Design a protein with these regions (language model features):
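N-terminal Rossmann-like or analogous alpha/beta NTP/dinucleotide-binding catalytic cores
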Residues: 2-8, 13-135, 283, 296
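Short, histidine-centered active-site or binding-site loop motifs used for metal coordination
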Residues: 11-13, 44-46, 143-144, 205, ...
Length: 338
């Protein structure tokens, strides 16, 4: 591991993971895990920035970790851990809060979008979400962070805080915090809603028909694809801006089948929606079956799951505490003699 560069990423346990989480994030981690020292977090502190059910949070956290492994993450070479189990996340977040100008935060696009959705229920936590994300990344001296286009601004904020507000102010020679670089995930990075091709597939969408969950049984997948928004045109296209639903479903089919987009377009040039929906349904059911089988084995083996998380937490906590100690020392905090 010593010679490998390190990556850090994570998903919120805010409900069932869907194919957007899988194809846009987890599937890419599976590809990267052999090349990088990989730390993967279940970001449960982020999950409480919006309305949530306390009775479901712990269950969803375990389920998310199990799905990481079921989707192909290898706990023998990756550290899988739970954010709230490592107090350094919250502590570094507070330190970064005190170093970050508020006008930097006011520029965050996602807060503006999400605050409209939440109305009067917007919390300080939602506003502060990007600072906690910065703490998540910077704690682990990540060399790279896999991000989609919608998360680029948050990573840029983490980089700016580390360089301009910590390194430049408190260290004249060696950097206190490592400046992470993005790995922009193009393949499947933005899987869209089944009922509105202009919106990203989301766990928070109240309409269950907008997404395919990783644990959906075949009959539910069939029903959701059958009801997915389509149009009156013949042929399934990718580059027609007036047909976002066509582009979205073709992208999903392309990734799952392992075929190039151009090959899929040629294959379905004169195919009607009914035929295409039948084919993509079959592909989804076939692709999700091994994930669902492995998930059921894991979720029914709490000893194995706890072992995976305990080992991951131990590695993550050791690394996080080293970084936090370094930051606090450079920023002038009192250190108790032992």
């Amino acid at each position: 591991m010593a010679n490998k560069k390190r990556i850090l990423s994570g998903v919120q346990p805010t409900g069932d993971l869907h194919i957007g989480n899988w194809l846009g994030a987890i599937n890419n981690w599976v590809t990267l895990q052999e090349q990088y020292e990989t730390f993967l977090c279940v970001v449960d502190l982020h999950a409480i920035t919006a309305s949530y059910n306390p009775k479901e949070l712990s269950k969803n956290t375990i389920s998310t970790a199990a799905l990481y492994v079921a989707c192909g993450i290898d706990p023998n070479i990756c550290s899988i851990f739970v954010q709230s189990q490592i107090s350094a996340h919250s502590e570094l977040c507070w330190i970064l809060n005190c170093m970050t100008p508020i006008n930097w935060m006011e520029r965050m696009i996602q807060f503006k979008e999400k605050s409209i959705q939440q109305g009067n229920n917007v919390s300080i936590g939602l506003f502060d979400y990007p600072i906690l994300m910065a703490a998540d990344i910077l704690l682990y001296d990540a060399d790279f962070v896999p991000v989609g286009e919608d998360q680029k601004q948050h990573l840029e904020l983490a980089r700016d805080i580390a360089q301009q507000r910590i390194n430049a102010r408190f260290s004249k020679d060696k950097n206190i915090l490592k400046i992470p670089q993005p790995i922009i995930m193009k393949n499947g990075s933005k899987i869209m809603s089944l009922i509105d091709g202009s919106k990203k597939m989301s766990k928070s969408d109240p309409n269950e028909g907008s997404r395919i969950n990783l644990l959906d049984p075949p009959e539910i997948i069939t029903k959701k694809i059958k009801r997915a928004k389509s149009d009156s045109s013949i042929g399934i296209e990718f580059n027609n801006p007036e047909r976002p639903e066509s582009k979205n479903l073709l992208m999903i089919y392309s990734i799952l089948s392992g075929k190039e987009i151009s090959q899929c377009e040629n294959e379905f040039l004169e195919t009607g929606w009914g035929t295409f929906k039948k084919l993509i349904t079959e592909q989804l059911i076939e692709s999700l079956e091994p994930i669902q089988k492995k998930y059921k084995l894991l979720i029914n083996d709490p000893y194995q799951l706890n072992k995976i998380l305990n080992e991951g937490n131990e590695k993550a906590e050791d690394l996080a505490n080293q970084t936090l100690k370094r930051v606090k020392s450079k920023l002038g905090f009192f250190e108790m003699e032992k």
